[in-house]
């Protein structure tokens, strides 16, 4: 992979998103399908993999008073603005909200959970005259199929099964090679990395000025002035990531910069690293480079653990990337960066994902705190040895082990979590899907 490849990959994976990306994905698919039809909507049929449903069923939608994937699909069908991508929810108005609520109230929005291992969202929007259909696969905005009635408008399904060339190149790299590539980049090429800091900082500022969520961030902020937590780098990072996540999960009307398809991953990476860079008085160039490194490493880990899995990606992928980045910002060696990754694997691998919701703020705070501890241990020559559990001799082998723990290791965990969360009418369907796997 060369510099141009890295910039291109980062521009694919580090993008703005308004709202939790799972309901946004459902809305985007419905918007694309609805754009192909006219007239009054008589049915909206949504199909999605269990992980997508799990992550979107309990999270707030910005500018909207209801939660759930039915409402997300209805909003998309009314908006029809699929070309806005992951920011399509910016188009919500009171009249759009009323129309979406009315569609769900008519009981014409239906969801089917389907046996797809990776991210999958299919939408069919029906009117009296036409039937529009869309399929999103692989990542939250990757529309691979569109049809109007029997006429195929777009079909990229054959190419959607695997990674593209850029991701294949990243997959084959070592952590050290990702570090070297980021170190050689120019600020003019990586300046867009700072856009994510500004965007996510705006969400944190919004939370500081408004009553948002259930008080997680406010309490952490207050605790920094007390005797138990104190005001230090670890507590400030915990507060920053928690405030952004709590705001985003409860419908803050601002977009965040995502990473590897997840807004909370982007929050973890950008806010934790920005706070650390401020603490060490890093230059803008150093900040740009370390953000590029961490975003690339986050994608690298997610390619092993899965886009939507039983593991909390914010803790397992994003916060592990933060641990490596904190070592990076202190001038640590490649070996110490690798050791921070191994320490994180020993620490919080197995943290479950039980869907997108306000409680994610707690997990982001916990994982970020673990990142600070893991980096501090690594900088002082402490690493969990390869004979301990899933830890291996190299960060690459350890990351591969994390992936194996996720899939197939935690498939049954995902089954249990999803069946605990979904409405009773979906339980047997979900169990049968996981049995087939």
Predicted regions and their residues:
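Alpha-helical support elements that line or immediately flank enzyme active sites
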Residues: 23-39, 266-283, 323-331
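A structural signal for small-residue-enriched, beta-sheet-centric alpha/beta enzyme cores
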Residues: 3, 17-21, 51-52, 137-141, ...
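Membrane-embedded translocation segments of transport machinery
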Residues: 227-231, 235, 248-281
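Conserved phosphate/anionic-ligand binding catalytic regions in large, soluble enzymes, centered on
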Residues: 16-32, 254-271, 313-317
């Amino acid at each position: 992979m060369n510099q141009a490849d890295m910039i291109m990959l980062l521009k694919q994976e580090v993008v703005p998103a308004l709202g939790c990306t799972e309901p946004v994905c459902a809305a985007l698919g419905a918007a694309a399908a609805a754009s192909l039809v006219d007239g009054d909507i008589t049915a909206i049929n949504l199909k999605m993999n269990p992980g997508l449903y799990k992550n979107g069923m309990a999270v707030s939608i910005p500018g909207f008073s209801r939660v759930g994937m039915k409402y997300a699909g209805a909003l998309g069908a009314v908006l029809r603005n699929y070309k806005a991508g992951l920011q399509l929810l910016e188009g919500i108005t009171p009249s759009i909200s009323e129309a979406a609520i009315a569609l769900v109230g008519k009981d014409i929005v239906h969801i089917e959970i389907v046996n797809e291992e990776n991210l999958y969202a299919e939408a069919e929007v029906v009117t009296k005259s036409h039937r529009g259909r869309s399929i999103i696969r692989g990542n939250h905005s990757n529309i691979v199929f569109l049809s109007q009635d029997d006429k195929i408008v777009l079909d990229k399904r054959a190419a959607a099964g695997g990674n593209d060339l850029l991701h294949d190149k990243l997959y084959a790299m070592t952590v050290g090679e990702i570090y070297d590539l980021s170190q050689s980049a120019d600020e003019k090429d990586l300046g867009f990395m700072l856009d994510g800091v500004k965007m996510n900082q705006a969400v944190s500022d919004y939370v500081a000025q408004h009553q948002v969520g259930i008080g997680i961030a406010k309490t952490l902020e207050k605790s920094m002035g007390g005797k138990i937590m104190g005001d230090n780098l670890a507590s400030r990072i915990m507060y920053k990531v928690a405030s952004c996540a709590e705001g985003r999960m409860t419908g803050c009307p601002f977009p965040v910069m995502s990473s590897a398809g997840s807004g909370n991953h982007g929050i973890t990476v950008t806010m934790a690293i920005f706070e650390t860079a401020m603490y060490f008085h890093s230059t803008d160039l150093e900040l740009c480079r370390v953000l590029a490194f961490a975003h690339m490493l986050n994608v690298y880990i997610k390619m092993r653990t899965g886009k939507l899995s039983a593991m909390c990606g914010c803790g397992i992928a994003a916060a592990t990337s933060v641990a490596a980045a904190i070592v990076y910002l202190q001038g640590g060696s490649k070996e110490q960066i690798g050791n921070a990754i191994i320490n994180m694997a020993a620490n919080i691998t197995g943290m479950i994902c039980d869907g997108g919701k306000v409680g994610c703020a707690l997990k982001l705070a916990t994982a970020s705190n673990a990142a600070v501890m893991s980096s501090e241990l690594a900088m002082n020559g402490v690493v969990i040895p390869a004979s301990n559990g899933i830890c291996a001799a190299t960060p690459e082998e350890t990351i591969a082990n994390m992936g194996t723990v996720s899939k197939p290791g935690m498939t049954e965990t995902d089954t249990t979590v999803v069946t605990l969360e979904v409405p009773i009418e979906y339980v047997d369907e979900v169990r049968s899907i996981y049995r087939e796997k």
